């Protein structure tokens, strides 16, 4: 049994499905006690059952500050501290430039940017020396991607958050890094297109990856667990791509 993270307290936002769920499972497998958030209770309950007997699910929307207050109040009461924060909750839509609405823009930036900022800010009183913050970025933050400009811009903001927050937190011994997945086969990826077009999307994306395939959520989870661990103790303000080389060539 891997006990790298034994005794650590972790929070994974957006932890009920996809990358968040796989990461929560990996953190728990390495010994951490894991709290997850999600917006849908049924998915949250199912995820907790898949993670560990000690896992805790809290229904919350990270774009709502009152929800975040409730999350951290519970962790403070039950644990008194937080060692690992994976600010993962987010999402986006395929939106051509001429079709983007104010509502869509506000929703995507509300979760991916505003939500990440306040997820981290409100965690600060619980984070102590040696804590690790990991943000979910994306390869699209450094590439032009048709019909994906709002999501891409939101993830570029997340990348800069890590750079800036590493400076804001210097002296506290808290590391801030970004894990940036490429095409990972998750429900969220499939939901970008109608069901009849999903395999075509998967094939087109895999063709752009030097390794010739899509990634698995668990592969991102292992990268997050590494960044959360003492093995990454001198890694700060960096971006770790888990993309099979897609954004690097």
Cite the ranges covered by each PLM segment:
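Conserved glycine-rich cofactor-binding loop
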Residues: 9, 16-17
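Short, small/polar-rich loop/turn modules that mediate ligand/substrate recognition or access, typified
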Residues: 86, 170, 175, 235-237
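Substrate-binding pocket helix/loop in short-chain dehydrogenase/reductase
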Residues: 96-97, 101-109, 201, 205
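Active-site helix of classical SDR
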Residues: 120, 154, 162
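Alpha-helical segment proximal to the catalytic Tyr-Lys
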Residues: 125-126, 167-168, 233
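Residue(s) in the substrate-gating loop at a strand-loop-helix junction
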Residues: 138
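Short C-terminal tail/terminal secondary-structure segment
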Residues: 143, 225, 236-249
């Amino acid at each position: 049994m891997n006990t790298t993270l034994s005794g650590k307290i972790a929070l994974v936002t957006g932890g009920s499905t996809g990358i968040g769920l796989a990461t929560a499972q990996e953190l728990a497998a390495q010994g951490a006690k894991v709290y997850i958030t999600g917006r849908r209770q049924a998915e949250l309950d199912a995820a907790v059952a898949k993670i560990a007997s000690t896992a805790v699910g809290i229904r919350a929307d990270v774009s709502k500050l009152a929800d975040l207050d409730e999350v951290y109040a519970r962790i403070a009461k039950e644990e008194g501290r937080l060692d690992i924060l994976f600010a993962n909750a987010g999402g986006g839509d395929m939106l051509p430039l001429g079709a983007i609405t104010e509502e869509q823009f506000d929703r995507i930036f509300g979760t991916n940017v505003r939500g990440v900022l306040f997820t981290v800010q409100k965690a600060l009183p619980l984070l102590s020396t040696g804590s690790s913050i990991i943000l979910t970025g994306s390869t699209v933050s450094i590439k032009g991607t048709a019909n994906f400009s709002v999501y891409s811009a939101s993830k570029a903001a997340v990348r800069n958050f890590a750079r800036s927050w590493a400076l804001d937190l210097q002296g506290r011994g808290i590391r801030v890094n970004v894990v940036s997945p490429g095409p990972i086969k998750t429900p969220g990826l499939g939901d970008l297109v109608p069901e009849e077009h999903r395999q075509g999307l998967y094939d087109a994306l895999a063709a752009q990856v030097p390794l010739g395939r899509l990634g698995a959520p668990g592969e991102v989870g292992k990268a997050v667990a590494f960044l959360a661990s003492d093995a990454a103790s001198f890694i700060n303000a960096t971006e770790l791509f888990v993309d099979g080389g897609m954004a690097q060539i």
